[in-house]
């Protein structure tokens, strides 16, 4: 038995599919399947109930998966401790980002991070909040950049910046010539939203409910770009995070307006595991990002108005 065997087992437990598990481990399906069988032979116990339709773990298999996750987390800590003995800001770093942050934040910070930390090898992973936090907990990710939510409170949260939400409306909407929109004016309106699983959906829904608005249930988008295109087509209005808003007040059939009284905002933060030996690395990374984004939204909102 070795660490790689445990990684195969955990991957199979996560994906419940041999091919997808093999792909995630960057090996062939026969290789992964063969190693699982060898592990069973070595332990003298069946870990899987083999059926043609799905992967089912035996009780012994489930217990071993739980222990394997613990072992892999400890291995991650050992690697971090070893890394700490060298240069703090060097070597590989796996960063997770949510889809409503990654595409819009990365162009602002990646050039700066490469210049500030040239020896840092960054690997970027995009997924929804619950998936990123699970991967962070298992040790697959080193840190995560997301909108801080209740689920992230179990980790160390380092706030980076507060991001305003802006109203996106189609160009012939009655509000198109306004400079801003009080949140109270949204009362009775129905707004387009992202599908379930996006933390931005829950946050935007909260802002809407407080203002007396509701969700347009005829359509749920998979991405911010889909929302934007639906607004441009005149299918509705929505709230978009400021990083996803262009510098122009109006572009491609969409008008972007600041929301006021109150201004809806979400806090973007960097999250990492408690007790990580590489705390200094994550804190330095957060400080660099915070400095890079300082004042960004003040100037962006002035341009929009």
Model regions and ranges:
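Short helix-boundary/capping micro-motifs
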Residues: 10-28, 52
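Residues within helix-turn-helix
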Residues: 18-23, 30, 37, 133, ...
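A short LG(V/I)-centered, amphipathic sequence patch enriched
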Residues: 40-57
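Hydrophobic hinge/microswitch elements
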Residues: 128-141, 146-147, 195-257
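Flexible hinge/capping segments at coil-to-helix
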Residues: 152-191
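Secondary-structure junction motif
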Residues: 175, 190-211, 278-287, 292-302
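C-terminal effector-binding regulatory domain of bacterial HTH transcription factors
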Residues: 242-254, 261-305
């Amino acid at each position: 038995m070795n660490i790689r065997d445990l990684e195969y087992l955990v991957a199979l437990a996560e994906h419940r599919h041999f091919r997808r598990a093999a792909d995630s481990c960057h090996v062939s399906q026969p290789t992964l399947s063969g190693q699982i069988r060898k592990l069973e032979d070595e332990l003298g116990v069946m870990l899987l109930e083999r059926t043609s339709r799905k992967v089912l773990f035996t009780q012994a298999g489930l217990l071993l998966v739980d222990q394997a996750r613990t072992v892999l987390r400890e291995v991650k800590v050992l690697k971090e401790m070893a890394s700490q003995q060298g240069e703090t800001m060097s070597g590989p770093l796996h960063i997770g980002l949510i889809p409503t942050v990654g595409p819009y934040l990365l162009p602002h910070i990646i050039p700066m991070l490469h210049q500030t930390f040239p020896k840092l090898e960054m690997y970027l992973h995009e997924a929804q909040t619950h998936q990123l936090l699970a991967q962070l907990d298992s040790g697959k990710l080193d840190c995560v950049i997301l909108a801080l939510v209740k689920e992230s409170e179990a980790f160390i949260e380092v706030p980076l910046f507060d991001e305003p939400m802006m109203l996106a409306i189609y160009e012939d909407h009655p509000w198109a010539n306004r400079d801003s929109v009080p949140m109270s004016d949204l009362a009775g309106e129905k707004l387009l939203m992202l599908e379930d699983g996006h933390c931005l959906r829950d946050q935007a829904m909260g802002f809407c409910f407080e203002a007396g608005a509701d969700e347009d249930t005829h359509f749920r988008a998979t991405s911010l770009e889909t929302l934007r295109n639906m607004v441009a087509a005149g299918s509705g209005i929505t709230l978009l995070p400021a990083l996803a808003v262009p510098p122009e007040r109006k572009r491609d059939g969409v008008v972007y307006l600041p929301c006021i009284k109150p201004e809806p905002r979400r806090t973007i933060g960097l999250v990492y595991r408690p007790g990580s030996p590489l705390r200094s690395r994550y804190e330095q990374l957060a400080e660099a990002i915070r400095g890079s984004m300082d004042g960004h939204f003040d100037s962006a909102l002035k341009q929009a108005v």
